[in-house]
Regions:
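Intrinsic disorder/low-complexity signal
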Residues: 2-3, 113, 203
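C-terminal outer-membrane/trafficking sorting elements
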Residues: 70-74, 192-239
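Short alpha-helix capping/helix-loop boundary micro-motifs
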Residues: 79-83, 216-217
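A short, polar beta-strand/turn micro-motif
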Residues: 10-62, 82-153, 158-196, 238-239
């Protein structure tokens, strides 16, 4: 006799695919996940995953020295991100994340799909709301939304070039209250706030990206292939 064998479905979740249908169909199911989300250990990545990961899973998948920061409060028009009390990733919640290891290939693991969305919102002393919004599928940003580039700078999206305002899935972006003059925000590491540089407008010509050979790539949108590029006279690497 052959014992019954339980077949667990493989659910692919990709940063470049519309995951809406497959996440809805598997909401609440414990499945084998195939995750395609490239991550760099050289800068803060924004993440938002449709599943929970505990400390053991994070250490196994991304390395024990991986760092997580969550949006905690607003102080002096700055969004402050701190290390969470527990090293864990909650489904649908946006984070800043820096893995110990660069992640270039697919990851395979067991997890329960949770198709929720928990945008993190905090108000300043005047009651104005600052939002850190996670997305699990490619999403079109509005002109006033802000994303974090691979150079750890903040950018408004390019609304003039078709498709340039779309960020890939399993990321997060920032929504500031209307009329706010906030130009920076802070990552708080072990009680020390490190400010990330001024917000840039990707519609400006001084944010044009070129290859190292001088070929024009286009305006910076945070979604460049691997390589060495030049922007504003400075070289930077996308891994």
């Amino acid at each position: 006799f052959i014992d019954d064998v339980k077949v667990v479905r493989l659910v692919p979740v990709s940063e470049s695919a519309d995951n809406t249908a497959i996440l809805a169909a598997n909401d609440g199911n414990n499945v084998n996940v195939k995750l395609d989300r490239k991550l760099s250990n050289e800068y803060w990545n924004t993440i938002c995953f449709p599943f929970n990961l505990d400390e053991e899973q994070i250490n196994t998948l991304f390395g024990e020295a991986s760092q997580i920061r969550e949006f905690n409060r607003v102080e002096n028009s700055e969004m402050v991100f701190v290390e969470p009390k527990e090293k864990a990733i909650v489904a649908g919640t946006p984070y800043l994340f820096k893995p110990e290891n660069n992640i270039d290939n697919s990851l395979f693991f067991r997890a329960t799909i949770d198709n929720s969305n928990n945008a993190t919102v905090y108000a300043d002393a005047e009651g104005k709301e600052y939002k850190f919004v996670g997305v699990t599928s490619p999403t079109a940003l509005q002109a006033t939304d802000i994303f974090i580039g691979t150079d750890n700078s903040l950018y408004y999206p390019d609304m003039e070039t078709e498709g340039a305002n779309i960020i890939n899935g399993m990321r997060a972006y920032i929504q500031l209250p209307e009329g706010t003059d906030a130009k920076t925000f802070a990552i708080n590491t072990n009680g020390v706030a490190t400010t990330i540089s001024n917000i840039n407008n990707t519609n400006d010509s001084n944010n044009m990206v070129y290859t190292i050979g001088g070929q024009k790539v286009g305006k910076y949108n945070g979604n460049l292939p691997k390589g060495i590029y030049v922007m504003n006279g400075k070289k930077f690497v996308v891994k």
